Amino acid sequence: MKRTNIVWTALFIAIFVGTGPLPAKDSAPKDLWDRVEHHNADSSGVKIHYVALGKGPLIVMIHGFPDFWYTWRKQMDALSAHYRVVAVDQRGYDLSDRPAGIEQYAMPLLVDDIGAVIKAEGRSSAVIVGHDWGGAVAWTLAMTHPEWTQALIILNLPHPSGIQREIKNNPQQRMNSEYAFNFQKPGAEKNLTAEKLAGWVKDDAARVHYIEAFKRSDFEAMLNYYRANYPRPDQDSAALAPAPLPKVTVAVLEFHGLGDQALLPGALNGTWDLVEKDFTLVTIPGAGHFVQQDASDLVTATMTDWLARRIH
């Protein structure tokens, strides 16, 4: 297995930690919004909305918080020249269903949603791409359903065992995770608005779409991802110990914008020991949490080249 022994900073939230990423040039076609196909998948009675573009091997792209399918606008056009590119609205967001209850956002259900999308496309497997919470879903899917996974691309989300290890052992990391612990508190969603959640979006035209999508979304559902899946501050150290997880058996490409400070670099250590095939890590100085937008040209070109060598 190839090792790229570079440590990067992690997780999500430029809007709450003020990372100041690179100015983003919106190079996506202006009509991409109108050119995508809209579809729905049935995940055990929960409607999962997704958009699609292109023909060829299937790529499924999964957004994080606070986001929706449009986060991938700068990758979809280039990749769709050779692939069938699907971008999902996760449950709780935009045009997907918003089931009530914390238990409805447990990781196994989020993984099953992606399986339903793959099935709706008439395929048995796909390249899985995930950012932030979408990255957590992507890691978990690759570990628990390798038969669905042709290759894995992760953006700004460390391997789950690395996150748990750092929260357990690193006091600074626990401090940097306060935003997530606050999201777990009852009623935290009352402090959110569509406009506030879209505040990180730099492109004015794109921000309009984001505000509209967030007004269709459920803020409580968004925070239920944290309540159902993120380590809790009141857990003892034994409960925070990383559980043994299966190794990832496909090739992995991982990006990280080094301007993202919500997770410290130690969370990346040892990731190469958890992947059986080649593991490529790309760190991008000056880019923040939303690296797919902050460094869109580099991310897209790297994805295109990496996939061309592996997926035909």
Residue locations for each model-derived region?
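Catalytic histidine-centered segment of alpha/beta-hydrolase-like enzymes
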Residues: A287-S296, T300
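Flexible "cap/lid" subdomain of the alpha/beta-hydrolase fold that forms the substrate-access gate
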Residues: D26-H39, V46-I48, L58, V86, ...
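Conserved HGGG/HGGXW glycine-rich cap/lid loop of the alpha/beta-hydrolase fold
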Residues: A52-L95
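Sec/Tat signal peptide C-region and signal peptidase I cleavage site
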Residues: P21-P23
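Bacterial N-terminal signal peptides that target proteins for export
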Residues: M1-T9
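Bacterial N-terminal signal peptides
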Residues: T9-G18
